[in-house]
Amino acid sequence: MSRVSQARNLGKYFLLIDNMLVVLGFFVVFPLISIRFVDQMGWAAVMVGIALGLRQFIQQGLGIFGGAIADRFGAKPMIVTGMLMRAAGFATMGIAHEPWLLWFSCLLSGLGGTLFDPPRSALVVKLIRPQQRGRFFSLLMMQDSAGAVIGALLGSWLLQYDFRLVCATGAVLFVLCAAFNAWLLPAWKLSTVRTPVREGMTRVMRDKRFVTYVLTLAGYYMLAVQVMLMLPIMVNDVAGAPSAVKWMYAIEACLSLTLLYPIARWSEKHFRLEHRLMAGLLIMSLSMMPVGMVSGLQQLFTLICLFYIGSIIAEPARETLSASLADARARGSYMGCSRLGLAIGGAIGYIGGGWLFDLGKSAHQPELPWMMLGIIGIFTFLALGWQFSQKRAARRLLERDA
């Protein structure tokens, strides 16, 4: 086995272990934020939505800067610093008794993610061969699902005693992850050339097709982020107990572990990436619309199952499509920019979703936020369809001219 192949194989195992630690640390804390501050402390959902949206926007919106810096200086220093910063954010969250302190803790957490997320994504693109990326992203998603349910179970158990224990556990896991990277991650370069920060960012922003695709995905993310805000609140309201939230993540884990990899393997042989992304988004959108009209936990979990199946179809295709569009000369910058849609869609989804949830509750129209999210998903589906049809038309024109 050549040294390059050996490095790729070792890199795969490193990425999987690193990803599990990050997922556990994140899901111990974040699914319980809305339960803690909305249900237990009586805050308005929009206040918590602002905090979650701020974290999302900072982490993903500034990702292009984090990626460009990583292109220049390498992955290791950015990843270690970012993980320690997230640990500090979680520690601060444990003592948050005013909205501004929760917002500050989410700001710290988001800045940490800005530093470590783009270089971690770029390492996947660097180490995994193009023909294997779809399956590897599926493995990461399966791991995300298993880690989410384990983290949510652990966090729910700790929440019975003290929310500070929840946050301390998340902080410790990120400190361990920082130590793991500091000890074992080689000083790998992310790009084929050591690209200056400004040049990497400029290269991405001039790629109009990539930027348009990324911004359109904001609508997809408005739906996707509700697993952290409105869906846990809805499950808690219908079930009457915060402990029911863990079953939502258990459903996701079961579906992902049984369906994600087989669906990815089968669909990559029969369907284009664009079609898989659009089909998943359509299922997610249609499953969102009736959520506000259900009154039983069984009906709610059925709709959540459909939502997760849509995500299982769409997410590996989205990741693979984003990676395939990245320029090898500025991988970190491209993977950072690919999170821009998540920054915008996540922020709007959290803040707007929280506001619509409060508005629907006060107006006795609980279906309002869910119908709006479904409509946004349908419009995003149509916009992506138009973009992909334009791209195919341009390709056919070039082939005819040749």
UniProtKB/Swiss-Prot annotation:
GO molecular function: transmembrane transporter activity
UniProt key word ATP-binding: no
Protein name stated in the entry: Multidrug resistance protein MdtH
GO biological process per UniProt: response to antibiotic
Transmembrane segments: 13-33, 99-116, 139-159, 165-185, 214-234, 244-264, 277-297, 300-320, 340-360, 368-388
CDD domains: MFS_MdtH_MDR_like
NCBIfam families hit by this protein: PRK11646.1
Keywords: Antibiotic resistance, Cell inner membrane, Cell membrane, Membrane, Transmembrane, Transmembrane helix, Transport
Subcellular location: Cell inner membrane
Cytoplasmic side: 1-12, 117-138, 186-213, 265-276, 321-339, 389-402
PANTHER family (alphabetical): MULTIDRUG RESISTANCE PROTEIN MDTH, RESISTANCE PROTEIN MDTM, PUTATIVE-RELATED-RELATED
